[in-house]
């Protein structure tokens, strides 16, 4: 069982990320814009982690200045810049196209990991990658006809996939010197502070006048932000970057089931086909 724990960490992270839509939808219905949700996730995650580690693990606060560029990469490049590209893609293309462009990330991680870390590109890994991409295409509805695109939108989507993939490249460099907790904390230092330029304080005050939205925001921060980053980074310390990124493709499947169970979204055969592909992918990589 211990052998599979890192894989379970990554799958758990994907499941937590898949719940983002649950919290986002409640906040957006209350009038919260996407930019402020990014601030809540990233800066809220920083505040929570600072409080936790101040009480339990103060060693995470100490890193060498020469390693700060690594955390600029994981925090600003792979959190803030990625989010901006993804939101821009959603403005210019359909949501289905945006999602499938984002999930080119595992392919990019596999290629970059081969170049940077000399990870082998095996037949098993290529099969799992193909299954993951096929599964994501089923789940996101790209075959349903909702496929409006623009050239600029595609570039932003591919950019989002690339920036998203870079977390799995930058983080292992940090893990060579620090614990997963330290890597996650300093990722949020850069990502949280780097998100503040997106803040719309007036909008946030209006939404949080309803105390229930504060609880929703806390759920977003704990369940779909801090916890998955801790789980994924801990798994990444023991699993190849390429495999980890492919396994994280479980996220859109979970997101689809959250929509079905929480919001009564229609059950689609495509979702179950996607789930089958992703589960087969996990079995192949076991």
What are these regions (language model features)?
Residues 1-40, 146-173:
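Glycine-/small-residue-enriched transmembrane alpha-helix faces in small-molecule transporters
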Residues 8, 42, 140-142, 213-215, ...:
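C-terminal-most transmembrane helix of multi-pass membrane proteins
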Residues 18, 22, 76-80, 84, ...:
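Hydrophobic/small/kink-forming positions within alpha-helical transmembrane segments
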Residues 22-34, 60-61, 91, 140-152, ...:
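Membrane-interface helix termini and inter-helical loops of multi-pass transporters
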Residues 65-66, 102, 115-138, 147-154, ...:
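Loop-to-transmembrane alpha-helix entry segments
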Residues 21, 50-96, 102, 138, ...:
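Specific transmembrane alpha-helical segments of multi-pass solute transporters/efflux pumps
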Residues 29-81, 108-109, 162-170, 184-203, ...:
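Transmembrane alpha-helices of multi-pass small-molecule transport proteins
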Residues 40, 79, 83, 98-104, ...:
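Helix-helix packing/entry segments at the starts of transmembrane helices
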């Amino acid at each position: 069982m211990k052998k599979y724990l890192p894989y379970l960490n990554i799958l758990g992270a994907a499941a937590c990320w898949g719940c983002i839509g649950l919290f986002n939808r409640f906040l957006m219905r209350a009038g919260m814009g996407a930019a402020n949700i990014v601030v809540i996730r990233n800066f809220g995650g920083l505040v929570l982690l600072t409080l936790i580690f101040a009480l339990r693990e103060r060693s995470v606060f100490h890193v060498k200045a020469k390693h700060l560029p690594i955390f600029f990469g994981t925090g600003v490049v792979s959190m803030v810049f990625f989010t901006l590209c993804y939101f821009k893609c959603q403005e210019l293309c359909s949501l289905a196209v945006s999602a499938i462009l984002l999930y080119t990330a595992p392919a990019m991680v596999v290629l970059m990991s081969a170049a940077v870390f000399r990870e082998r590109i095996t037949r098993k890994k290529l099969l799992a990658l193909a299954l993951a991409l096929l599964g994501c295409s089923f789940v996101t509805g790209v075959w349903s006809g909702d496929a409006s695109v623009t050239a600029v939108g595609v570039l932003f989507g591919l950019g989002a996939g690339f920036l998203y993939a870079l977390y799995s490249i930058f983080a292992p460099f940090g893990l060579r010197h620090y614990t997963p907790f330290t890597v996650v904390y300093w990722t949020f230092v850069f990502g949280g502070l780097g998100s503040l330029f997106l803040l719309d304080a007036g909008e946030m005050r209006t939404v949080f006048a309803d105390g229930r939205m504060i609880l929703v925001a806390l759920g977003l921060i704990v369940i779909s932000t801090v916890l998955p980053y801790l789980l994924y980074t801990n798994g990444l310390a023991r699993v190849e970057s390429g495999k980890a990124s492919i396994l994280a493709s479980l996220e859109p499947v979970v997101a689809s089931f959250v929509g079905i169970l929480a919001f009564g979204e229609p059950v689609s055969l495509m979702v179950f086909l996607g789930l089958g592909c992703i589960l087969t992918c996990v079995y192949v990589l076991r």
